[in-house]
């Protein structure tokens, strides 16, 4: 993609309304634009990142045996009355009426809808287990939306829901998602620490938040430093191995880890002083087991092996892709701009032509772009008639993993320059060696 043809509305000045790094950089890098309080348009660069985050989430959910669906954003109020949550949810929920005066709502979550879908089709224990998920837009009318997409009113959410015959089977479904989330965050280049959490309006008696550490985190967290180096299960992990998965979950919950809401100072004091870590954290995922909280009032039942009807046991599991984009920036940036992990970078390579219009530079850049794209790498080619300093600033701001710098001086010696954005390391090499060099990392 040529930058001269791309829509990248970069801001030269830091927006006054941006309070945290991710909000500031997302606005400056032309990733998003605010349309109303807590509501954002996703522009091309930001949308590429958002889609890549969703791709990673889908891959890990599919690996764990979950099945993707898509439920309506506008939901019937009657379903929420069945579960008892319509009046309890409060002003966060946007309520509306259609032309026939039927009460509807803009779904902040989808436990009721997915339960209705399940009860209409499942009849027997032989229909279990099931894990259904979607990636769709949600709306919660926050009192004070702030921090850009970190705490917005409209947001993209991956929400999943499991259905099992009993508590033991439901716990295995919970463990599957627990492990798949560890893998998801690892693939995204984030170290997420699972912490016991309050179940809030979702309900239930078992819940974990997945927290990444960041100086601008929204809450204070306390944990054992052991979590910083714990191994994450590999892609080959067997999600059908009940004991094996339980062992992984046990190891990842055996050390102290708590948000400020759940923190117990006396228990934390038992952790060796050198291992205690107090920091700021950002929630990037939340999982719940809530048993029959929804299935009982909504009559989502199946016939068991004994021929008796019983309500199914359920869990729900959320990751916010739009929030994850901001959280990744909070965890990975420097003074010059964003530093994207390879897995979700909008493009792999920033190709910088230092002298547009020079026949040798133009020809070399065309050949390099073709070679990189043939090798399966995505390229954003800066072919603008701008001074080199402006091009370097743009490349650092948008944070693509690699910068390939092509200029007359280097080409005279048959060389180009390669810069790794994360480390700042530079090297010169022959253009023909470039694809293999990048692929080697």
Curated annotation (Swiss-Prot):
GO molecular function: ATP binding; proline-tRNA ligase activity
Location relative to the cell: Cytoplasm
Function description: Catalyzes the attachment of proline to tRNA(Pro) in a two-step reaction: proline is first activated by ATP to form Pro-AMP and then transferred to the acceptor end of tRNA(Pro).
Keyword Aminoacyl-tRNA synthetase: yes
GO biological process: prolyl-tRNA aminoacylation
CDD domains, per database record: ProRS_anticodon_short (cd00861), ProRS_core_prok (cd00779)
Assembly information from the UniProt record: Homodimer.
Alphabetically ordered keywords of this record: Aminoacyl-tRNA synthetase, ATP-binding, Cytoplasm, Ligase, Nucleotide-binding, Protein biosynthesis
Protein name as annotated: Proline--tRNA ligase
Top EC class for this record: ligase
PROSITE patterns (alphabetical): AA_TRNA_LIGASE_II
NCBIfam families (UniProt xref): PRK12325.1, proS_fam_II
Main location: cytoplasm
This enzyme's EC code(s): 6.1.1.15
SUPFAM superfamilies: Class II aaRS ABD-related (SSF52954), Class II aaRS and biotin synthetases (SSF55681)
Catalysed reactions, semicolon-separated: tRNA(Pro) + L-proline + ATP = L-prolyl-tRNA(Pro) + AMP + diphosphate
A cellular component term, taken from the record's GO annotations: cytosol
Taxonomy, superkingdom: Bacteria
Gene that encodes the chain: proS
HAMAP family: Pro_tRNA_synth_type2 (MF_01570)
UniProt record similarity statement: Belongs to the class-II aminoacyl-tRNA synthetase family. ProS type 2 subfamily.
